[in-house]
Amino acid sequence: MPEKELDYIRSTDAAGSTEKDGGIYIDAFDKQDNAPPKKGFAKFIDGFRRADAEELGIDPNLSEAEKIAIMTANSPLTRSLKNRHLQMIAIGGSIGTGLFVGSGSSLHTGGPAGLLIAYILIGTMIYCTVMSLGELAVTFPVSGAFVTYNSRFIDPSWGFAMAWNYAMQWLVVLPLELVAAAMTVKYWDAKTNSAAFVVIFYVLIVAINFFGVRGYGEAEFIFSAVKVLAVLGFIILGIVLCAGGGPQGGYIGGKNWYIEGAPFPNGAKGVITVFVNAAFAFAGTELCGLAAAETENPRKSLPKACKQVFWRITLFYVICLTLVGLLVPWNDERLLGSSSADASASPFVISIRNAGIKGLPSVMNVVIMIAVLSVGNSSVYGSSRTLAALAASNQAPKIFGYIDKQGRPLVGIIAQLLVGLLCFLAASDKQGEVFNWLLALSGLSSIFTWGSINVCLIRFRRALAAQGRDTGELVFTSQVGVIGAIWGAFLNTVVLCLQFWIAVWPLHSSPSAEAFFSAYLTVPVVIVFYVGHKLWTKNWQVYICAKDIDIDTGRRELDLDLVKQEVAEEKAYIASLPFYRRVYNAWC
């Protein structure tokens, strides 16, 4: 049965209605623009003008939260991301230096078994989180997505803290990644000043985002395709090398699991350290949910994208890291590289060099450089959309809500690019100290974001039950349900607690204030945002009661009876398919 795409109410009758079913009252959809279309340079200049602010016939009796939900649901952001963009962002978006390089230090710290255990556990948490995000984002494909869900389902102050936490995470990531990209070039050219390459990569990121969400989508499609092909190629090569098929021959098998110290060289504390590192390696997984508001058909595309996460975790992380643990000894000194972008510290590169294969290490360094640029590109997208959502929610200066006629949150993009100029500190003698603190500022941001997404799903389901509704009105539900959301929230809490332990008593070093704040700075920053908002608004309510949560405003599917009928028909259609088709539909 072909899926149908329902849309927002688009009639003047609905706009004038005082009914609150859905809470969306749009007054200007039928407005006609009789002006002749602009061409050439005039069209180019006109594209930077603010998008026409639609007159939203908002019921003045609505609460502030409901008004905000309406505004975020009707953002001028363009819905031009296609299914292929979202699928590739989901499957390859967060494959970066955390896998290609960071897994090296994790192998050295936790050993081959510790590495595998940590990534599998964190992988289950990520899968549950993305499933929770998918259910919410398909139901409420609004500007800012999970950035705004916290204010709706948990508490406005927590939403404020989480939104600014997420915006800051991406704001500081751009200069870090630009410098990291320039450092990858040192693999071939150690003489040229890094600042020269920083300029080149900075201009590239500016050019990509000049083309709006479509530019971001196409760039990520290419970047992710390269990363996926590289990982698949390594898996094939790794199996051949383990079996003794490399140029130097010799069966490797599992011997590196039995060398001195393996498979747990640093015991439980080493595994816990890897546990935290593994969480950082998955950062950016949630971006497919943020892109829901700019996707042509989120009802069809987003569930497929969420299901792809299972394959990314299984294929790209678990299988790859199993091979890494087999091919590279945990005590190889090269694993302790000087930076997160040092290709010589990549276990992928080390395994290729150990096999005596020439040329491929350089190819792998290109992949690492592309992975770094991909994260930098995503940082502009993530921060600008978050700032726009904050402005629409009255939680940031209104200027950040400026969205031009091409659907670009222009002021947010400019703000991110200005912060990106910090990358030129690469020429400073204090660059290491500055970037370490920038990294500390964003270190635990993803943990807070993922934990909050799971709590939002739990609160949403509670609100449905409290208001006499059920999941029969949802076009997509999490495959792991509330139990999965509880597991995801629990594991994120565990990571925060374990990181506190590592921050107070670091592995192989003495406790110090500097070590603590470099590992745990995000937590006091979040507390300051949360308490500050409480003091400013004088709203002392800890959480929104389930019966008071708005579960209608911002929905794309407003005719709930029709939705229930379509969901029932779709389930019946799937049940009639052959077994292999049902399995494929469940996992793909």
UniProtKB/Swiss-Prot annotation:
Knockout or disruption consequences: Leads to a growth defect on medium containing phenylalanine, valine, leucine, or methionine as sole nitrogen source.
Glycosylation (residues): N61
A Pfam family that the UniProt record links to this protein: AA_permease
Bilayer topology term: Multi-pass membrane protein
Keywords of the record: Amino-acid transport, Cell membrane, Glycoprotein, Membrane, Transmembrane, Transmembrane helix, Transport
Gene Ontology BP terms: amino acid transmembrane transport
Localization annotation: Cell membrane
Molecular function as annotated in GO: amino acid transmembrane transporter activity
Primary location group: membrane
Induction: Expression is under control of the CSY1 amino-acid sensor. Induced during biofilm development. Expression is repressed by nitrogen sources. Expression is repressed by the antifungal agents ketoconazole and flucytosine. Expression is also regulated by NRG1 and TUP1.
Any GO CC annotation of this UniProt entry: membrane
Record-annotated membrane-spanning stretches: 88-108, 113-133, 160-180, 193-213, 221-241, 271-291, 309-329, 366-388, 409-429, 438-458, 482-502, 512-532
Record's function text: Amino-acid permease with broad substrate specificity. GAP2 is the only amino-acid permease with very broad substrate specificity, none of the other GAP permeases is able to transport such a variety of amino acids. GAP2 is also able to transport thialysine, and thus probably also lysine. Functions as a sensor via detection of some amino acids including methionine, leading to a rapid activation of trehalase, a downstream target of PKA.
UniProt record similarity statement: Belongs to the amino acid-polyamine-organocation (APC) superfamily. YAT (TC 2.A.3.10) family.
Name listed for the protein in its UniProt record: General amino-acid permease GAP2
UniProt source species: Candida albicans (strain SC5314 / ATCC MYA-2876) (Yeast)
